[in-house]
From Swiss-Prot:
GO cellular component assignments: cytoplasm; nucleus
Family that this chain belongs to: Belongs to the SMP-30/CGR1 family.
Lineage: Eukaryota, Metazoa, Chordata, Craniata, Vertebrata
Main localization (coarse): cytoplasm
PANTHER family for the chain: REGUCALCIN
Compartments where found: Cytoplasm
Protein name, as recorded: Regucalcin
Enzyme Commission identifier(s): 3.1.1.17
Amino acid sequence: MSSIKIECVLPENCRCGESPVWEEVSNSLLFVDIPAKKVCRWDSFTKQVQRVTMDAPVSSVALRQSGGYVATIGTKFCALNWKEQSAVVLATVDNDKKNNRFNDGKVDPAGRYFAGTMAEETAPAVLERHQGALYSLFPDHHVKKYFDQVDISNGLDWSLDHKIFYYIDSLSYSVDAFDYDLQTGQISNRRSVYKLEKEEQIPDGMCIDAEGKLWVACYNGGRVIRLDPVTGKRLQTVKLPVDKTTSCCFGGKNYSEMYVTCARDGMDPEGLLRQPEAGGIFKITGLGVKGIAPYSYAG
């Protein structure tokens, strides 16, 4: 086992950092701060951060094949023009639910942008239940709705053979799997592959590694856990010096580093004194496993 090193590479003070995505061409980490309505890009070489503020909560960001990015802003799928710091709406969901917003999102191997919604929280993880749904934005900009009755639509990724879709609805305390049809984007046969233990708290963001194992950030649990979705066993726990770990992705040279986002919202002054790096961006090295490159939206 190589020795694991955890460092806060960016003391960003995110209210709720989320959706880390590695952009190989710029050696940068993209991420969002949801309630601050910001999309951020941290250059791993210069250590500089560029921030773009939107007009509604920004819950996820993804790469786009034609250049620029796509993001979920409020209840809208948007295209982002980074240079002009502007967003163009591609589609809107949940028109009948004025209190909803998007949460986590990610692009599938065919270039569709998957993202789910939730009711706006009154406090972290406190919200009206069953208000959310899971959607995907196809490259032609039409939207498919998969299911509703979601509490907090969260982590998502696809198996290495693209035949399984993994998904987290946080308040189910479960990591679920679906059969996945890459050609059509259809999902079926939902089942649980891992139930979180009490001390692991709330499952949040998720990514897959090059060995097909899942990494889940545990909100209020201060850790990321590595799971085998085939056996349902937890293989590894990596604890961080902050409680409110929100999401994770691989990046850096050969995708050998893990980046973890976290939150400050909901912490009292004493907690912030105890965890001064809360809201920062963390880099974990020495895991001994690599990730895979993120997919880009094809529209």
